[in-house]
């Protein structure tokens, strides 16, 4: 980003160690949702999402293991994307091998108010870096499919989705369909087992991050 002419403004708030869907910590305090203080800005990149939503900066950076870019973007009404692992090189100050099983799920990505800015930011971030052997240098855009397809999931075993959530999912499917997408309502298999497995992975990662005596 610096090589492309970006001017860093500052660092924004996040919860301790990340991995939380809210943004609060003892050092900097709580970050509020910019549109309603009674709601969360999401996490763990909640400070960045709130700053972008209020116009403090046009574009920002965060990282995502299980939703830390996507969740705050949703909560604050902005755009983001979790790039495919390896698309954006993971060049960090800490050793990634020390965070356990969650390491292969971690990737950096852009946050912005507009999808067009996400596209521009991702084009700058993406590519191979000598310090990340998992990074790849492949084109961001390829041959477009003849027909776009979307699977609509409105039910998850063991979880009762709020009616408002189901309504928004249906509305999203309607908009896609009106724009030429092939939208099919499906039942995703074994999502309940996915939650169990993900819980184990997160707990293991937390143990790796815990102070050692």
Model-derived segments and spans:
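Short glycine/serine-rich loop segments
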Residues: 2-122
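Short helix-loop capping/hinge segments that flank enzyme active sites or metal/cofactor-binding pockets
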Residues: 145-153, 201-213
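Acyltransferase
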Residues: 2, 163-189, 210-213
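Generic beta-strand/beta-sheet core signal
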Residues: 11, 62, 153-155, 186
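Short glycine/threonine-rich loop-to-helix capping motif typified by GTGT followed
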Residues: 165, 194-204
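Short glycine-biased active-site loop of nucleotidyltransferases that positions the nucleotide triphosphate
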Residues: 70-73, 141-144, 198-199
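A short helix-breaking turn/cap at a secondary-structure junction
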Residues: 82-173, 190
């Amino acid at each position: 980003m610096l090589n492309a002419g970006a001017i860093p403004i500052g660092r924004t708030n996040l919860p301790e160690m990340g991995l939380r869907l809210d943004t609060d910590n003892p050092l900097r305090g709580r970050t509020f949702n910019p549109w309603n203080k009674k709601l969360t800005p999401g996490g763990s990149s909640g400070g960045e999402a709130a700053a972008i939503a209020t116009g403090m900066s046009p574009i920002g950076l965060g990282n995502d293991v299980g939703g830390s870019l996507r969740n705050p973007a949703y909560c604050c009404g902005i755009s983001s994307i979790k790039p495919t692992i390896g698309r954006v090189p993971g060049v960090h100050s800490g050793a990634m091998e020390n965070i356990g099983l969650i390491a292969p799920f971690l990737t950096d990505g852009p946050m912005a108010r507009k999808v067009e800015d996400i596209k521009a930011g991702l084009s700058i971030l993406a590519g191979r870096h000598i310090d990340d052997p998992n990074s790849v240098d492949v084109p961001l855009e390829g041959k477009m499919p003849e027909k776009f397809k979307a699977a609509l999931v409105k039910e998850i075993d063991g979880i009762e989705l709020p009616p408002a959530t189901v309504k928004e999912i249906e509305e999203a499917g309607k908009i896609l369909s009106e724009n030429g997408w092939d939208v099919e309502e499906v039942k995703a298999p074994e999502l309940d087992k996915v939650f169990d497995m993900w819980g184990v992975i997160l707990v293991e990662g937390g143990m790796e991050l815990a102070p050692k005596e």
